[in-house]
From Swiss-Prot:
The keyword Repeat does not apply. Plays a role in virus cell tropism, and may be required for efficient virus replication in macrophages. Interferes with host NF-kappa-B promoter activity mediated by TLR8. Mechanistically, inhibits the phosphorylation and subsequent nuclear translocation of host NF-kappa-B RELA subunit downstream of TLR8. Promotes the expression of the autophagy-related protein host ULK1 to degrade host STING and inhibit the interferon response. Also inhibits JAK1- and JAK2-mediated signaling and thus negatively regulates the IFN-gamma signaling. Induction: Expressed in the early phase of the viral replicative cycle. This is Protein MGF 505-7R. It comes from African swine fever virus (isolate Pig/Kenya/KEN-50/1950) (ASFV).
Length: 528
């Protein structure tokens, strides 16, 4: 069974206007000194069919009046008991508080609902075991500045003064602007810089700006927080680093208002690949070509991304004035990406870089560079010859051509393309060391001997003649005669003398006849 009272209390409908007070009391729908009360919709009630209140506002009013019957009714209508307790605290109706005390698990949960500081404190006092610090923490969370003002002297007391920093951090984290300002104006904050870290993490520009107001306007003026120019600069640089790292351009610009360095911001942006920051500052701060080149060196040194390098190069139209310094950073940091970008824009610094590498670096660096840029063996060898780097030529040639005969064959081709005599002789010397270190087939040695004759390599040819003499066959005789013919054509007397000497040996040994010798020299005289 159900009663008419239950039906009326649990449902939403309008009451008839002719219901008398006694009837309403029997139905449990009468509020002393207010009149009839019924549920108008889910979250509202109507008093005397005219005044509309939210259920929770009505609960707070009932709590102030200590009307437990109305409180029970409104709780049936899904009201929040906390509002009734708040009303009771405000009016100090402790009987109602005692009645519902056991239903409150944590008195701190009521604090955000309270607007009045006195009621706020009364409520907090009901949390057994809490101290002044706990009250101040919740005052900050609930933006109750007046409570902090009330306990200012306590905060300055040595017993709790060390807690100022944690309260300041809490105010920053909960973004209580008025409280932050008040703390900055009235209390000695041990580490006011915390506000900047929190502002950057939460991306709160207003909080970031407020930090400077506290440090430079309030604390420094009052002598609480002294900053020398050096410390001020360090502080601003740190803030720039944080802001750029997060890509927060407005924060970077804010530091400039207090003396932050544009160059510092650009350097950080380059290292962190923050292109939006770079682009804005370059376009709005009148950055010189020289400064951009310095940023480019930094980008190379720190291995910045392709997009960052491209952006910096675009500002100077891909034309670097101080190539030497750029190459210093490229090779010093083993960072060659910029060379590839310039090469794509028809700016070739690869040869210059390779020359520097060959001259000053190790075999491994040179090999890596050659492979990275697909440099032809001929180009590398010519540079190495110019720099007189015989060891590195030998080692890299061994990597390229494992077969010594093939190695000699390619090197001979390169010798023919070198235009200056000293370079040709240098490479011929290397070829000869390869010959000395390996056992070549006779036909390869014969070809090498002919090559030496063509380039008038007297000493090396003389060395090979020993092999030719030891192989006293018809093949050897033919090569001696061919060498004589070439030496005669090119007028190399030293070579001719060596060949003549070995022809005499062959004649003495019976390998060559008098007629063959006469025929060879007859050809010589005919040419003369």
């Amino acid at each position: 069974m159900f009663s008419l009272q239950d039906l009326c209390r649990k449902n939403t409908f309008f009451l008839p206007n002719d219901f008398k007070k006694h009837t309403l009391q029997l139905l449990g729908l009468y509020w002393k000194e207010h009149g009839s009360v019924h549920r108008a919709e889910k979250d509202n009630i109507m008093i005397q069919n005219e005044l509309i209140l939210t259920v929770n506002d009505a609960l707070q009013l009932a709590g102030e009046e200590g009307d437990t019957d109305v409180v029970q009714l409104l709780l049936l209508w899904e009201g929040n008991l906390h509002y009734a307790i708040i009303g009771a605290l405000k009016a100090e109706n402790y009987n109602l508080i005692c009645e519902y005390h056991s239903q409150i698990e944590d008195w701190h949960a009521l604090l955000p609902l309270i607007q009045d500081p006195e009621t706020f404190e009364k409520c907090h006092e009901l949390s057994l075991g809490c101290d002044l610090l706990c009250l101040l923490q919740h005052a900050i969370k609930c933006n109750m500045l007046s409570i902090l003002v009330k306990y200012k002297e306590d905060l300055l007391n040595a017993r709790i003064r060390h807690r100022i920093q944690s309260l300041f951090v809490l105010a920053c984290e909960t973004r209580r602007i008025e409280i932050i300002l008040w703390i900055g104006q009235n209390l000695p904050i041990p580490e006011p810089e915390t506000i900047f870290s929190i502002a950057v993490i939460t991306k709160d520009l207003e909080l970031f700006s407020l930090g400077y107001k506290i440090i430079f306007d309030y604390m420094q003026r009052q002598g609480i927080f002294q900053l020398s120019e050096v410390v001020r600069k360090i502080l601003l640089n740190r803030h720039i680093d944080m802001a750029v790292n997060k890509g927060l351009l407005p924060f970077v610009l804010e530091t400039f208002k207090y003396g932050g360095s544009v160059k510092r911001a650009l350097s950080c942006a380059v290292m962190d690949n923050k292109r939006k920051v770079i682009d804005y500052l370059v376009r709005h701060e009148n950055i010189s070509h020289q400064t951009i080149e310095r940023l480019l060196y930094l980008a190379v040194k720190k291995h910045s991304s392709r997009k960052t390098l491209n952006l910096l190069l675009s500002y100077i139209n891909y034309k670097v004035k101080n190539i030497k310094k750029l190459l210093d950073h490229v090779l010093g940091g083993n960072s060659t990406l910029v060379l590839k970008i310039l090469l794509e824009k028809k700016q070739n610094l690869v040869d210059a870089a390779l020359t520097r590498l060959v001259k000053h670096s190790t075999y491994f660096r040179v090999k890596e560079f050659i492979e990275d840029f697909s440099i032809s063996p001929e180009k590398f060898i010519k540079i190495a010859v110019r720099e007189q780097k015989n060891v590195i030529i030998k080692v890299i040639c061994e990597d390229i051509w494992e077969n010594p005969a093939e190695r000699i064959r390619y090197l001979k081709q390169i010798v023919s393309s070198i235009k200056y005599e000293s370079g040709r002789q240098f490479l011929i010397n290397i070829i000869h060391t390869i010959y000395q270190s390996h056992s070549l087939k006779p036909e390869e040695i014969f070809k090498l001997a002919t090559f030496y004759v063509k380039h008038n390599a007297v000493t090396h040819f003389k060395d090979l003649c020993k092999f030719l003499w030891l192989n006293r066959g018809t093949e050897s005789k033919k090569h001696f005669l061919k060498c004589l013919e070439i030496a005669d054509e090119k007028d190399f007397p030293a070579i001719k003398s060596i060949v003549s000497e070995y022809i005499n040996y062959m004649f003495t040994a019976g390998t060559m006849t008098k007629d063959e010798i006469m025929q060879a020299y007859a050809s010589e005289y005919t040419m003369c």
